[in-house]
Amino acid sequence: MKTLILFLVDILFGYVPQAAGCAICLFAVTNQNLRSRKFWLTTGIFSAIAIVIRTAYNINLIDFGFHTIIIWSIFILVAIGYNKVPAMRSICSILLSGIFITDTELITAGSMILIFGSENFTKMMNDTETMDGRIVKAICGIPANILFVIVVLVFYFIKAALKRRKLQKEAQTISENL
């Protein structure tokens, strides 16, 4: 039962929000509409990739750190192949997602250290031997993932507003020149 709980927490509050955040960032960088079916398919593909690669890491097929590089590399290939996004924009969006994820995880870790204390936080993060410890660690990641999605949504809406403003200025310039 605890294995199922960990699996569900990891998927619903870990892989899916991070995949959605990466997809939102990709769509922001390329000025695509989030309401499209392609966004949801991209999120699903990104989630599946992350689940498979992280599972390979969890069963010691991949060393720590390499799983992130592999996941991001495949995300870039999906963005180029499936989403038809130019390579540089794909790379920029995934790297920007990585920066956002790192920042939100640092903010969350700092907050948890303030709340629980450094020693307790370190114990929570290092207790991966027991199923309870792994569940606690997964739950501790939820605030960072929520914050990550909020940050990339803000980024998306700022980019959309800037694009709208630019289009309005161009339309105004054209109408003035007529």
What are these regions (language model features)?
Residues 118-136:
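Short, membrane-exposed interhelical loops at transmembrane-helix boundaries
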Residues 1-18, 137-141:
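Hydrophobic transmembrane alpha-helical segments in integral membrane proteins
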Residues 11-32:
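N-terminal signal-anchor/start-transfer transmembrane helix
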Residues 42-61:
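A generic, lipid-embedded transmembrane alpha helix
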Residues 32, 46, 50-51, 71-97, ...:
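Short helix-perturbing small/polar motifs within transmembrane alpha-helices
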Residues 9, 132-155:
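Hydrophobic alpha-helical transmembrane segments
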Residues 161-178:
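Short, highly charged, low-complexity non-transmembrane loops/tails of multi-pass membrane proteins
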Residues 98-114:
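Mid-bilayer segments of alpha-helical transmembrane spans in multi-pass integral membrane proteins
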